[in-house]
């Protein structure tokens, strides 16, 4: 018998591709009620961060002048244990005046690493223990 969880499970190999992006979107929809489109793409991320993230091999849009992604915004809210409400976060009117940006940053990667008890170097290596830990957690919810 195959359960829904195992049927939708993603690979836990420490490499982030479109499958991990889709899994994260589903995970954020489940735990944050984020209402994200599950398309397997983390949109509009700063190209300057790509060298810091060699473990990301697909499912990301690296651009100059990045506007950010609702998926990363939801993940940042989750990591900070804050409710997700997209319109409020962008203008600073979220809880305690918080602004959650939707771009990947070194502090954001360190926050993800701290969540999993992994050494905080602000990188997503190839392959990455941090990505593998996230993939394992995603599989608990999708």
Map each language-model feature to its residues.
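Cell-envelope/ECM-targeting effectors and their regulatory/trafficking segments
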Residues: 1-142
